[in-house]
């Protein structure tokens, strides 16, 4: 099942989706028919330039959403919050898929509509994600920051082209669950949703405001394609530290540009990002695999287990042994 659209200020996902699949739409609520699966899609209009789309369903077929880049310039931004337990495949420009879920460093995506993307939702898997659509001018007014850093300045500037990723903390996950559970029959439901969405945006932009205050490069489809190729290379063997000269040569980008765009997009240097992913995998293996601390350390390429223990404690606040024994 494929749903394809071209990004624009006028595009309304829930209306076009209901027409394409012949599903009735009532009060901006679309119930997934039993023939397709179960769940719903809900739109909440929070203002002329501010809206929310809630996706919560389990489908019988793989579901692919293809977003084509906007034909005309627009200052509409899309902010995706992936609250899935299971990773989703996100593809830019037909490159290899990148895994996204609430548990990784890229669970939140902030992007302009001039970038194409393909998201694949696997069949028989619970899908939960929220999309906030807002114009840069409306967002600038909401944030009300007198002296924004370069990241916030770029995001709230009309005509900019960018893609940013952020991790999702427990607070954000709880807010998303609260939003999905709001009773929309309540007279003040829209107001409550707006309060919660603003809280959601506060946590996101508070983190983005703490990023290094350096000049931001415009990001284009070809750049996004190369950055995801680099990310995939890093994730393909997290027991092997990334070597920037080789990465730059592989994707055909200068080392300087690669380092700057990667840090700009993912919020950290290539090596630090690699270490975060490495520690996330260590935490998962310690809890789920039944491996011993030494087995996890060696599996992730650590020859010195003391170094592994110190690094893990730096990220998680406890030693691997203590972490593996806690519930």
Model-identified regions with their sequence ranges:
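…primarily DNA-binding HTH/wHTH and HhH modules…
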Residues: 310-327
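Short hydrophobic/aromatic patch on the recognition helix
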Residues: 257-258, 262, 307-308, 312
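N-terminal low-complexity or simple alpha-helical regulatory segments
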Residues: 1-75
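Alpha-helical bundle regulatory/interaction domains
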Residues: 1-5, 87-90, 94-222, 227, ...
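Conserved hydrophobic/aromatic pocket- or pore-lining residues that grip, position, or stack substrates
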Residues: 193, 234, 258
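Short, conserved beta-strand element in jelly-roll/cupin
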Residues: 56, 73-89, 132-134
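Terminal helix-turn-helix DNA-binding modules in bacterial transcription factors
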Residues: 228-241, 245-246, 264-306, 325-327
């Amino acid at each position: 099942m494929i749903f394809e659209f071209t990004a624009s200020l006028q595009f309304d996902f829930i209306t076009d989706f209901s027409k394409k699949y012949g599903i009735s739409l009532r009060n901006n609520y679309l119930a997934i028919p039993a023939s397709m699966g179960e769940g719903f899609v809900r739109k909440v209009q929070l203002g002329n330039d501010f809206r929310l789309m809630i996706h919560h369903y389990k489908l019988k077929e793989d579901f692919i959403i293809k977003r084509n880049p906007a034909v005309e310039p627009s200052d509409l931004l899309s902010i995706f919050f992936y609250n899935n337990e299971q990773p989703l495949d996100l593809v830019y420009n037909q490159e290899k898929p990148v895994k996204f879920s609430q548990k990784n460093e890229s669970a939140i995506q902030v992007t302009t509509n001039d970038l194409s993307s393909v998201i694949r939702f696997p069949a028989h898997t619970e899908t939960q994600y929220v999309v906030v659509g807002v114009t840069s001018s409306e967002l600038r007014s909401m944030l009300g920051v007198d002296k924004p850093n370069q990241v916030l300045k770029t995001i709230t500037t009309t005509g900019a082209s960018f893609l940013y990723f952020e991790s999702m903390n427990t607070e954000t996950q709880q807010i998303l669950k609260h939003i999905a559970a709001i009773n929309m029959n309540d007279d003040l439901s829209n107001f409550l949703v707006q309060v919660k969405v603003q809280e959601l945006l506060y946590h996101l932009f508070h983190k983005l405001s703490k990023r290094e205050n350096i000049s931001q490069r415009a990001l284009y489809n070809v750049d996004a394609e190369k950055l995801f190729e680099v990310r995939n290379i890093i994730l393909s063997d997290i027991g092997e530290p990334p070597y920037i000269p080789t990465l730059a040569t592989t994707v055909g980008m200068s080392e300087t540009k690669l380092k700057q765009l990667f840090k700009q997009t993912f919020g950290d240097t290539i090596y630090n990002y690699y270490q975060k992913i490495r520690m996330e995998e260590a935490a998962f293996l310690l809890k789920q695999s039944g491996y011993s601390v030494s087995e996890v350390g060696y599996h992730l390429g650590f020859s010195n287990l003391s170094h592994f223990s110190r690094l893990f404690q730096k990220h998680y606040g406890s030693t691997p042994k203590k972490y593996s024994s806690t519930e």
